[in-house]
């Protein structure tokens, strides 16, 4: 199982945490497609705490964290 954690605005209309089977999920992009999250919505993408790209492969027991761009001033 892969644990997917969504933060801030990415949670809107979605769960905070997902558990996904690795059968159909091969990359972070597959996760984003499954959750209907566009690349432009994600500013920081971590796998097990390390910065990665959407095309990075995922493995069983990985923790994927997706963060949107954060604004403020």
Map each language-model feature to its residues.
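Ubiquitin-like/PB1-type beta-grasp interaction modules and other compact soluble beta-rich domains
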Residues: 1-72
């Amino acid at each position: 199982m892969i644990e997917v954690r969504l933060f801030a605005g990415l949670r809107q209309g979605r769960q905070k945490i997902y558990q996904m089977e690795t059968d159909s999920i091969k990359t972070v992009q597959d996760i984003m497609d499954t959750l209907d999250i566009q690349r432009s919505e994600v500013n920081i993408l971590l796998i097990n705490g390390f910065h990665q790209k959407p095309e990075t492969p995922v493995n069983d027991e990985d923790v994927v964290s997706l963060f949107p761009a954060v604004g403020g001033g």
